[in-house]
Amino acid sequence: MITISENAQQHFIKLLSQQAEGTHIRVFVVNPGTAKAECGVSYCPPDAVEADDIQLPFEGFSAMVDADSKGFLEDAEIDFTTDQMGSQLTLKAPNAKLRKVADDAPLFERVHYFLQAEVNPQLAGHGGECTLVEITDDGYAVLQFGGGCNGCAQIDVTVKDGIEKQLIELMAGEIKGVKDATEHERGDHSYY
């Protein structure tokens, strides 16, 4: 679930040695599954452990995760690096804003997850977004674009060379292509 690098483990052991005995760390997500999701690490004294917490044992300490954060911390990585500028603890949780779906989840859920996790972060740089409207019986993902994507002169490139190509590769045999259901209106909001 969570990978903690050797350097980060040593850092936590050092910090925890200055705390009350039995204190561990807690890894959590505030506002999980939303665009405002934020991850954190805090001390977890023995009296703060909840009955439904998940305990991840490491050498010298445990990482406690509350049940609500579990799915959002899948594939999370914690590292501690030191360079000439100082030291830094980093926590990367690629599923904090959107819970990872199982490989055998329904096709709609897998395509939706791909769009939210991979495509929308890139489109957001242009003020754009896309949502999955439906998957047709003949295997086409129907998308609706908004924000900077609406009316953008590059939308065909984004759809055909970007999203469609990746979806066909990732979901071979299940997705045949992508259709754009957006009524594009060029305006000041359009990126290109």
Swiss-Prot record:
Keyword Isomerase: no
Binding site residues for [4Fe-4S] cluster: 149, 152
One GO BP annotation of this record: iron-sulfur cluster assembly
Keywords assigned by UniProt, alphabetized: 4Fe-4S, Iron, Iron-sulfur, Metal-binding
InterPro entries named among the record's database cross-references: Fe/S_biogenesis_protein_NfuA, FeS_biogenesis, FSCA_dom_sf, HesB-like_dom_sf, NIF_FeS_clus_asmbl_NifU_C
Known function: Involved in iron-sulfur cluster biogenesis. Binds a 4Fe-4S cluster, can transfer this cluster to apoproteins, and thereby intervenes in the maturation of Fe/S proteins. Could also act as a scaffold/chaperone for damaged Fe/S proteins.
Pfam family, one: NifU
Family membership: Belongs to the NfuA family.
Subunit structure, interactors included: Homodimer.
MF (Gene Ontology): 4 iron, 4 sulfur cluster binding; iron ion binding
Cited NCBIfam families: PRK11190.1, YhgI_GntY
Cofactor note: Binds 1 [4Fe-4S] cluster per subunit. The cluster is presumably bound at the interface of two monomers.
Name of the protein: Fe/S biogenesis protein NfuA
Domain of life: Bacteria
Required cofactor names: [4Fe-4S] cluster
